[in-house]
Amino acid sequence: MRTPDAQMRAGHIPAHLIPDGTDPRTVVVVHHQAEARDWTGPILLALVAAGGSVGVVMTLCLLLQTAATTATALAAAAPAGVGLSISLKARKGK
């Protein structure tokens, strides 16, 4: 305990802080307590993160639904001749 602050935290009273003529046994050390923590920031951060996650999941679901609808429409239209077909005939001999 080299600093007065460390001595105060340990409950020791540095001699230079006691006024002359005071009985050290009657001195009371009052420790300062930290103020109550403000939880607004962490709670707001958690809500924004949860909302962002829900937004990402909803966007992915919408994208998947659009892709499935497009694939269904293409599969229904393929037998109607929308696709191109190429037939290759190989020549036998000269």
Curated annotation (Swiss-Prot):
<protein>
    <recommendedName>
        <fullName>Protein SpdA</fullName>
    </recommendedName>
</protein>
<comment type="function">
    <text>Involved in plasmid transfer.</text>
</comment>
<feature type="transmembrane region" description="Helical">
    <location>
        <begin position="41"/>
        <end position="68"/>
    </location>
</feature>
<keyword id="KW-1133">Transmembrane helix</keyword>
<keyword id="KW-1003">Cell membrane</keyword>
<keyword id="KW-0472">Membrane</keyword>
<keyword id="KW-0614">Plasmid</keyword>
<keyword id="KW-0812">Transmembrane</keyword>
<dbReference type="GO" id="GO:0005886">
    <property type="term" value="C:plasma membrane"/>
</dbReference>
